Amino acid sequence: MSWQAYVDDHLMCDIEGHEGHRLTAAAIVGQDGSVWAQSATFPQFKPEEMNGIMTDFNEPGHLAPTGLHLGGTKYMVIQGEAGAVIRGKKGSGGITSKKTGQALVCGIYEEPVTPGQCNMVVERLGDYLLEQGL
């Protein structure tokens, strides 16, 4: 399966039990900042934004004072899982990023999708990739 198929079929799909509800944007990004696959709506990000996210995975709390920036949008960092998941909130939407062995799985949402639904979609694929050694 191609990386783009993972984004299209496992991240940008309808959320279970909520037909028509899906993430706003999603991507799989290598830990070096290279985009492996993304939805057409995923924001163009700066290398330093991805570096900040990677630093927070290695040094939990790094982004808390400044917020998580992606594509010029600032998200307030909220509870995540140190070294594994970073979550951010902005208004009625937010972002979830799950670290795997080689990549980051990122999902961005807006209402009516809930933070929990975004977490479920992103973390399920991230856990699967971890199980596959990726």
From Swiss-Prot:
The modification Phosphothreonine is found at residue 114. Phosphorylated by MAP kinases. GO terms for molecular function: actin monomer binding. Transmembrane segments: none annotated. It comes from the Eukaryota. It is found in: Cytoplasm, Cytoskeleton. Pfam families: Profilin. A motif (Involved in PIP2 interaction) lies at residues 84-100. Gene3D superfamilies: Dynein light chain 2a, cytoplasmic (3.30.450.30). One of its GO terms (cellular component) is cell cortex. Belongs to the profilin family. Binds to actin and affects the structure of the cytoskeleton. At high concentrations, profilin prevents the polymerization of actin, whereas it enhances it at low concentrations. Occurs in many kinds of cells as a complex with monomeric actin in a 1:1 ratio. This is Profilin-3. It comes from Olea europaea.
